[in-house]
């Protein structure tokens, strides 16, 4: 998982989710695309 200042969708399977006041990118197809903002 990457922690970044700005998160972007890396593919069409990525979803942007808000959890606990943080923005996350979760990907069903490629788990390497997981990211968290902050």
Swiss-Prot record:
GO terms for biological process: translation. Pfam families: Ribosomal_L36 (PF00444). Keywords: Ribonucleoprotein, Ribosomal protein. PROSITE patterns: RIBOSOMAL_L36. The keyword Zinc does not apply. GO terms for molecular function: structural constituent of ribosome. One of its GO terms (cellular component) is ribonucleoprotein complex. NCBIfam families: rpmJ_bact. Belongs to the bacterial ribosomal protein bL36 family. This is Large ribosomal subunit protein bL36. It comes from Petrotoga mobilis (strain DSM 10674 / SJ95). The lineage of its organism: Bacteria, Thermotogati, Thermotogota, Thermotogae, Petrotogales.
């Amino acid at each position: 998982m990457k922690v970044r200042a700005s998160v972007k969708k890396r593919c069409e399977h990525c979803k942007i989710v808000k959890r606990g006041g943080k923005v996350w990118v979760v990907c069903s197809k490629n788990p390497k695309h997981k990211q968290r903002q902050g």
